[in-house]
């Protein structure tokens, strides 16, 4: 299904790049500056969970403290951010100072030398050193301490500077208390900031083995010995923080941080740029499906005027995405692909005219690096022979062909021309894990091979079919891409009923003399029918002849036309050895259900389309695969054909002296009534996507 490069609507669209300027802002944070650098391990461990966290914003910075009285000597740029704070004057223990110090980014200061650390000594130094030289600056989360909370009176903050304090095991607790109280009395520090410094001092003084506070998993602090703290010991593999027993010089300063669009998550950006409060119908996007480099969204009518902005936000926040598409209509095609619009495109290669950016090395097919397989080149060459072929459409096809990894396999997915659902990855793995070497897999609706390719890679002999010729071609591409052994995956392009009536019939009954030479089933045969909207309807090929008057659509049909559908499984050739028939073939059929009893409803859908009741011993497993909608579930029924079916098939063999039992009335325990078949067909039609 062709994808459009852009939408033509009556509504005007906002320029996609304009949102970036709209989210620019500046936030002022409280920052803790400390030295020596050797105390970083201990301090950062204590501050874990308390630092400012924002994308693309460093919360721990290297800075160099210099005397303000130097007049900025040695700084080449007048626009440098300078933070000023007080250093304790000589002989003044309370921290009041007559000397100012400034801090500038470390990378911008040349020739600065570190002041010698106070050392790992337990004795209190005679006089703390000035906070000068290389330091660390930690940006604090506003929930811990705001910039406006550094001083008691935020209105007079411009006239205040925070003193330098000496903390740690080398400083007596009484001295620290004296420093903090003096700063509080002088209005140079708020009580909240003083409490934080007091906590830092206590944690540094006691060391890692006797810390009085322990962090919970959510970053909150719990008293030592509390039930939550005692119940959550550190994991054995975690590293204990290094202790630091020297003095640490610290101070606070406000720090202005400029935030641009790179600082926000995708959901935050969308909430900021979309007028959610102005339009009740406009809700925040919950996410998107990613298929290789393609992001797929389902936009409502209210979102469409902002489609380009949404596409650009997704590109900006997800480096692995280069194309964003919007699903335009519901899936209605017989091939199960859907119409889509391209609403976001990363500037690498123009998807329409093929103009590449500088330095891009594209081959004649428009593929970077010449990574196409021989089968894929053949598929593209065949497309070029079509009377409706156009270069623009071919470029779109290449742009929307993704490479996906699942089960340790690589899949080339022409996303705009086949059906692919990444949410079924777990189900693909679950089913393939049930198979092994010697088994056979008959995949009736195989797509590009999410079941078939990994099964073949495990040594399973695979016969895979899809009605979509593009899907069938790309199964061959994926077989080559994953270096599958020759003939391990045989690909068919036919209707699913024809596949069941020919390939599966010949294999199960051995009706044909060596239909596939060299393929011998020493394990179990599996049949997958993963098209939940209509897969159960294909089971009508197994119905007894008396049940063929109701078509799959619930409308009465011509008896001779209906007989064609299930004639093969009601007439066993005379040369077939009944003992050679494989009656253990396991079917895995998918369907949708909105019933309260999901399991019963799923089994009943199988029975009414099959035309037989399934005894409990024939139902190996029934499970819910995933939620499709609030009241709709995807189900999988794994079963073998019941004894009544095989009795009916054997009775149809020429020379048995009786007609197929399905041609006559049968008990309700064996055959499902035709009226139920018609009702189930109507229900299945309602459940379609």
UniProtKB/Swiss-Prot annotation:
Protein EC: 2.1.1.228
GO biological process entries: tRNA N1-guanine methylation
InterPro entries: MeTrfase_TRM5/TYW2, SAM-dependent_MTases_sf, TRM5-TYW2-like_MTfase, TRM5/TYW2-like_N, tRNA_Gua_MeTrfase_euk
Binding residues for S-adenosyl-L-methionine: 428, 466-467, 495-496, 530
Molecular function via GO: tRNA (guanine(37)-N1)-methyltransferase activity
Enzyme category, top tier: transferase
Compositional bias (Basic and acidic residues): 679-689
Keywords for the protein's UniProt record, in alphabetical order: Cytoplasm, Methyltransferase, Mitochondrion, Nucleus, S-adenosyl-L-methionine, Transferase, tRNA processing
Top-rank taxon, per record: Eukaryota
Biased composition (Polar residues): 1-12
PROSITE patterns in UniProt: SAM_MT_TRM5_TYW2
Record's subunit section: Monomer.
HAMAP family recorded: TRM5
Name of this protein: tRNA (guanine(37)-N(1))-methyltransferase
Native source species: Leishmania infantum
């Amino acid at each position: 299904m062709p994808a459009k490069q852009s939408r033509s609507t009556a509504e005007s669209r906002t320029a996609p790049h304009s949102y970036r300027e709209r989210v620019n802002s500046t936030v002022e944070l409280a920052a803790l500056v400390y030295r020596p650098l050797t105390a970083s391990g201990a301090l950062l461990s204590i501050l874990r969970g308390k630092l400012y966290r924002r994308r693309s914003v460093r919360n721990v910075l290297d800075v160099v403290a210099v005397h303000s009285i130097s007049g900025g000597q040695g700084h080449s740029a007048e626009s440098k951010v300078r933070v000023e704070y007080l250093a304790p004057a000589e002989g003044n223990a309370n921290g009041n100072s007559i000397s100012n110090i400034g801090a500038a980014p470390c990378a911008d200061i040349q020739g600065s030398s570190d002041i010698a650390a106070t050392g790992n000594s337990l004795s209190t130094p005679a006089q703390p050193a000035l906070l000068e030289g290389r330091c660390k600056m930690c940006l604090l989360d506003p929930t811990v301490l705001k910039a406006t909370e550094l001083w008691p009176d935020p209105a007079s903050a411009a006239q205040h500077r925070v003193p330098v304090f000496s903390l740690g095991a080398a400083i007596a607790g009484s001295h620290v208390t004296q420093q903090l109280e003096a700063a509080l009395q002088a209005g140079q520090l708020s009580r909240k900031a003083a409490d934080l410094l007091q906590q830092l001092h206590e944690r540094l003084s006691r060391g890692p083995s006797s810390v009085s506070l322990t962090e919970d998993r959510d970053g909150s602090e719990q008293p030592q010995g509390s039930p939550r703290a005692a119940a959550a010991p550190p994991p054995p593999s975690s590293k204990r923080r290094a202790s630091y027993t020297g003095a640490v010089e610290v101070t606070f300063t406000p720090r202005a941080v400029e935030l641009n669009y790179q600082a926000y998550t995708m959901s935050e950006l969308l909430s900021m740029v979309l007028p959610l409060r102005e339009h009740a119908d406009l809700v925040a996007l919950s996410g998107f499906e990613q298929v290789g480099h393609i992001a797929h969204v389902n936009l409502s009518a209210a979102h469409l005027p902002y489609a380009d902005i949404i596409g650009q936000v997704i590109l900006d926040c997800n480096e692995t995405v280069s194309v964003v598409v919007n699903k335009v209509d519901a899936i209605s095609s017989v091939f199960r692909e859907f119409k889509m619009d391209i609403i976001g495109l990363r500037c690498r290669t123009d998807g329409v005219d093929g103009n590449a950016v500088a330095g891009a090395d594209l081959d004649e097919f428009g593929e970077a690096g010449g990574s196409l397989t021989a089968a894929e080149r053949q598929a593209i060459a065949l497309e070029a022979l079509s009377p409706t072929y156009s270069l623009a459409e071919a470029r779109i096809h290449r742009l929307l062909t993704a490479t996906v990894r699942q089960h340790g396999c690589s899949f080339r997915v022409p996303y705009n021309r086949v059906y692919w659902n990444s949410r079924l990855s777990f189900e693909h793995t679950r089913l393939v894990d049930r198979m092994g070497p010697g088994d056979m897999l008959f995949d009736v609706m195989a797509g590009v091979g999410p079941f078939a390719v990994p099964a073949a890679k495990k040594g399973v002999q695979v016969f895979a079919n899809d009605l979509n010729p593009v899907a069938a071609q790309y199964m061959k591409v994926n077989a080559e891409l994953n270096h599958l052994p020759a003939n391990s995956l045989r690909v068919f392009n036919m209707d699913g009923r024809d596949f069941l009536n020919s390939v599966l019939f010949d294999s199960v009954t051995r009706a044909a003399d060596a239909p596939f030479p060299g393929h011998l089933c020493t394990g179990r045969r599996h049949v997958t029918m993963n098209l939940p909207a209509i897969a159960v309807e294909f089971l009508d090929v197994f119905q007894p002849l008396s049940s063929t008057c109701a078509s799959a659509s619930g409308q009465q049909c011509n008896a001779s036309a209906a007989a064609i559908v299930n004639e093969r499984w009601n007439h066993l050739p005379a040369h077939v050895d009944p003992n050679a028939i494989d009656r253990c073939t396991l079917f895995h059929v998918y369907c949708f259900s909105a019933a309260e009893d999901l399991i019963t409803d799923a089994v009943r859908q199988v029975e009414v389309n099959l035309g037989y009741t399934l005894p409990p011993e024939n139902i190996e497993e029934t499970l819910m695969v995933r939620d499709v909608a609030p009241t709709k579930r995807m189900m999988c029924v794994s079963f073998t054909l019941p004894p009544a079916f095989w009795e009916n098939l054997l009775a149809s063999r020429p020379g048995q002296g009786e007609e197929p039992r399905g041609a006559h009335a049968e008990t309700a325990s064996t055959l499902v009534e035709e009226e139920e078949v018609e009702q189930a067909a109507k229900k299945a039609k309602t459940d379609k996507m």
